[in-house]
């Protein structure tokens, strides 16, 4: 049909070339008069087209063909009937549609070059680079990146996949969100196409799956992923996964799957510190072609402490209002523009919330955490809570001391220094600190 090539040409102008090549060019169109059917070689492509492109395809086909009714199906476009031969012939068996190697769904924008490194993510960055340079190496296969949302886990995953493709353009790298794996498996079960579902994974060089915590409680999904994992691991194909917490903390994940995930390298991605947050704001501003003064970047970094997405949201709001009003971006302009956002951020992480989170984490009563008792089981969690209050809020040392049953500001200062010193040598305390930071940043 003429409308589909014209539609595809318009889509090529609107979407990244790799996306068009991966998801849209494999489609074959059949005009049925009252509707148009787009055939995809496998269920993965059907799911992606339905989720990401179908509304725009309907708009374009309605414009070019006067018909916006579009259906998606797995298979290939039926051939036009051929003239019957003069002599009867025995019909041949229909040929199955050939499997098309999965080309991957990688966002090419995310690279190692534009990832801002800091103390909170430097180990994750190093691990992702190693996985891209030596895919399948048992030292980092699987590579599991875990931490709260918006900290850069998916950026590192995409960057590793893009680096793999850059080193070997023929490499087949598959990226899926966990719910896409689940949806594709359900569709394959309904279509009695599990063999095709499994073959997709046999053809790839690297598998990247986001947010595996959503596998929890889905027994059949975990069963299929378990076998997929084993096949890829045995074939030395690289596996990179993300999770919002350490997998052993995810209720509903099968013990054998948790064991498999521990075979390689697991790395925590923590909320960025002040210096990293400021560097991220400046880097994101440059990407947008916006010039912002350092003191504005420092303001945003000081106030927005939870994750990178919040930093980007604040920056986008600031740049958009500056463009709309024609005003220069200054500290005063930023404070005015982001006033409500900054107030909400401060309310989300307050000293009472920190105290309750620390008390719950260590199994303490709030009255004990705030008491004058100085036993080690109480003093250490109390010091951690004070240090977190200094790290995550704008309160002064005297204000923090007042919130802890009227303690002196020198007690708070000592607690902050003590915790910082102890974390250098005490791995368990460092782990507690990082877990509490993640909980408070969620």
From Swiss-Prot:
GO terms for molecular function: ATP binding; ATP hydrolysis activity; DNA replication origin binding; lipid binding. Keywords: ATP-binding, Cytoplasm, DNA replication, DNA-binding, Lipid-binding, Nucleotide-binding. Its main location: cytoplasm. One of its GO terms (biological process) is regulation of DNA replication. It is found in: Cytoplasm. ATP binds at residues 150, 152-154. GO terms for cellular component: cytoplasm; plasma membrane. Residues 1-75 are annotated as: Domain I, interacts with DnaA modulators. It comes from the Bacteria. It holds the Pfam family DnaA_N. Residues 105-322 are annotated as: Domain III, AAA+ region. Residues 75-104 are annotated as: Domain II. SMART domains: AAA, Bac_DnaA_C. Residues 323-442 are annotated as: Domain IV, binds dsDNA. Oligomerizes as a right-handed, spiral filament on DNA at oriC. PANTHER family: CHROMOSOMAL REPLICATION INITIATOR PROTEIN DNAA. Plays an essential role in the initiation and regulation of chromosomal replication. ATP-DnaA binds to the origin of replication (oriC) to initiate formation of the DNA replication initiation complex once per cell cycle. Binds the DnaA box (a 9 base pair repeat at the origin) and separates the double-stranded (ds)DNA. Forms a right-handed helical filament on oriC DNA; dsDNA binds to the exterior of the filament while single-stranded (ss)DNA is stabiized in the filament's interior. Domain I is involved in oligomerization and binding regulators, domain II is flexibile and of varying length in different bacteria, domain III forms the AAA+ region, while domain IV binds dsDNA. Belongs to the DnaA family. This is Chromosomal replication initiator protein DnaA. It comes from Xanthomonas euvesicatoria pv. vesicatoria (strain 85-10).
